[in-house]
Amino acid sequence: MTRLAVPKTYKLYIGGKFPRSESGRVYEIVDSQGGFLANAAKASRKDARDAVVAARAATGAWAGATGYNRGQVLYRIAELLEGRRSQFVEELRESEGLSEPVAQRQVDAAIDVWVWYAGWADKYVQVAGNGNPVSGPYFNISTPEATGVVAIIAPQESSLLGLVSVIAPALVSGNTVVVVASERAPLAAISLSEVLATSDVPGGVINVLTGSAAEIAPWLASHADVNALDLAGAGPELGRPSDCRRRDAQARASARERRACTIRRADHVLHGDEDGVAHEGHHLKSGVGREPRTGACCQRTGHLGWCNGTSGDGRRSICASGARRR
């Protein structure tokens, strides 16, 4: 009796789980010769929102972990990827039509990227941070911090090495990621998700969506809870890079306007100001410290900050979106 093979189902990876698309949609993945390989889930707007929610929920713990701990997690990914090297080589050969030596070099390079950034996890702060010379009786120190949720459009041609090369730099500093994998060849990305699920990466730190980048990218760009965009894999279907930046700027402006209105309403409740502007002497509980009053210098406190520059009537306004002014 002939045994039937068990076909693999390629799903999304959201919050450490493998759900099907909320819409129930799938699309066909073909090999370099046009032959059928598999069906992959086609992410919807709801899936993109769920991925952002999962990434935001994981931000605190991942950003709060020590650099040494994050380095250990990234190195563990490299270990597991090394153990499944032959599987990834075969998937790259089938989906991208690469020769055996080229596929092997790409998988080896992807493993090396994880090892490289694992080593940087507890060192980049010393390189990027510094003490700044100031004319005053205090210290001024710059230190890098996590941005938050980063939405990434992965390169379309290099489905594994390109994907790893955009994910690892975002993770090393404590960001969480929502990545749209290569639409044409997403098999390696979903197999990488299986590696992540069995590694020490907390659920929600990396979320992988498959489907149309042109369809998903605008939803991510306009999401108020996405802090940064990486358009490494943006192609003609998304328009020119300048068009992408313009749409992103419009979405950010709308989000800032909504956030500023929320801040004014909250300040009105806290301090009783009719115009929603904080007066001298009022300090929000979310503040993390004070800076010397030396003109326009904004202390980042999450989404709120104090602008120490005063207006003509002696009032100080609230900065939204954690702006930094020097």
In which residue ranges do the predicted regions lie?
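N-terminal Rossmann-like NAD(P)+-binding subdomain of aldehyde/semialdehyde dehydrogenases
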Residues: 1-136, 290-295, 304-309, 313-316, ...
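C-terminal segments
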Residues: 2, 112-127, 141, 230-326
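Conserved small-residue-rich beta-alpha loop and adjacent elements
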Residues: 119-202, 299, 326
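Short acidic active-site motifs
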Residues: 138, 215-216
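Generic beta-strand/beta-sheet core signal
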Residues: 153, 173-176, 180-182, 209-211, ...
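Hydrophobic/aromatic ligand-binding patch that stacks against planar heteroaromatic rings
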Residues: 168-171, 219, 244
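Nucleotide-activated donor-binding/catalytic signature segment of Leloir-type glycosyltransferases, i.e.
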Residues: 205-206
